[in-house]
Amino acid sequence: MKIYLVGGAVRDQLLGLPVKDRDWIVVGADHATLLSLGYQQVGKDFPVFLNPKTKEEYALARTERKSSAGYTGFICDFSPTITLEQDLIRRDLTINAMAQSEDGEIIDPYGGKQDLENRILRHISPAFSEDPLRVLRVARFAARYHSLGFKIASETLALMTELALSGELQHLTAERVWLETEKALNEKNPEIYFETLHKTGALSVLFSEIDALHGVPNPVKHHPEVDSFIHTMLVLKQAVNLTENNPILNKSAVRFAAICHDLGKALTPQNILPHHYGHEQAGIKPTRSLCKRLKVPSYFQELAELTCEFHTHIHKAFELRAETVITLFNRFDVWRKPQRFQEFLQVCLADTRGRTGFETKDYPQIDYINQLLHSANEVDVQQVIADGFEKQAIKNELTKRRILAVKQTKTNYPTN
């Protein structure tokens, strides 16, 4: 029996990156052997064993044979005669198919180290195309390692495109698509994930609402980048910058809202382009459709839909009437969910800066709207009750006093 460290831990170690999770492969053993050594089996379909001391995951070396459509349609062989090389060849990319022996030797039968040095994401064998999930995984790795100069090999991109066109992607469950996508949203360059999926044709299959933005023009005066898909990717990049070092914000939710904020532009009638009157309200339906299909968590969906509807309100914050401001606050339920509103404001800032040449533009609207929020929050609910108001009258009076507080702040707010 031999044990090897495999996959991402070996890859990241060679890249000089911190190793988060360590996965191990056991060669020359079976279930009974590991159980007799005190390992605890978890998972029925695919047996993984927990080391009794470290609690790290160990798996028996295996081979896979395609048996039906989708990413689960495989027959596995866990025989003790399976070699390390046989186990490694079933993996997706060469850089993920390296192993390290217990004495520290790197085993690299498929050229992963060379591809690591050359910054190439390359598939190992034609069996790559047997698993449609790999299209998303490779796009996610491209997003993760883009800042290090990694590119997808042309032949791998061609295979991903074949897979996207084959109909295999339709067999992926919503949960798996969202899991990969949420992971991608947390990478350094999530825009690369969506751009890669667009290049391969997978975006139109899995994220048709986002893909529909491609080629939809905006007025060049306000959007020098013109194209709505390009703008959305620039907004996503800005959202990354704004959330990367802010532990308070739900960064993947902010980034998802950034992607959805202009989905309504794909529905703009041709005869009024490049203008997009009413795209805010129009964006709610495609956002809801996307979220329902991919079973996106409700928090993400709510933030994305509200962002679609109200992002231009913040752009025009200085023009809003006090009544409109309070309606906005009520729609976001800022009284009970203050963080969500701050996340929304970050998307609005990302939207402003996600335009070619506007990357460092000042956005005083956030300070202004937060001042109005502060004044509205100063209104004391208990005082309203103490003043004798009851039931619905409490809510009505509270709204009146909040509007008055906002009006006073608007009047006294310094303008340059």
UniProtKB/Swiss-Prot annotation:
It comes from the Bacteria. PANTHER family: MULTIFUNCTIONAL CCA PROTEIN. Comprises two domains: an N-terminal domain containing the nucleotidyltransferase activity and a C-terminal HD domain associated with both phosphodiesterase and phosphatase activities. Residues 228-335 form the HD domain. Keywords: ATP-binding, Hydrolase, Magnesium, Metal-binding, Multifunctional enzyme, Nickel, Nucleotide-binding, Nucleotidyltransferase, RNA repair, RNA-binding, Transferase, tRNA processing. CTP binds at G8, R11, R91, R137, R140. Its cofactor is Mg(2+); Ni(2+). This is Multifunctional CCA protein. Catalyzes the addition and repair of the essential 3'-terminal CCA sequence in tRNAs without using a nucleic acid template. Adds these three nucleotides in the order of C, C, and A to the tRNA nucleotide-73, using CTP and ATP as substrates and producing inorganic pyrophosphate. tRNA 3'-terminal CCA addition is required both for tRNA processing and repair. Also involved in tRNA surveillance by mediating tandem CCA addition to generate a CCACCA at the 3' terminus of unstable tRNAs. While stable tRNAs receive only 3'-terminal CCA, unstable tRNAs are marked with CCACCA and rapidly degraded. It catalyses: a tRNA precursor + 2 CTP + ATP = a tRNA with a 3' CCA end + 3 diphosphate; a tRNA with a 3' CCA end + 2 CTP + ATP = a tRNA with a 3' CCACCA end + 3 diphosphate.
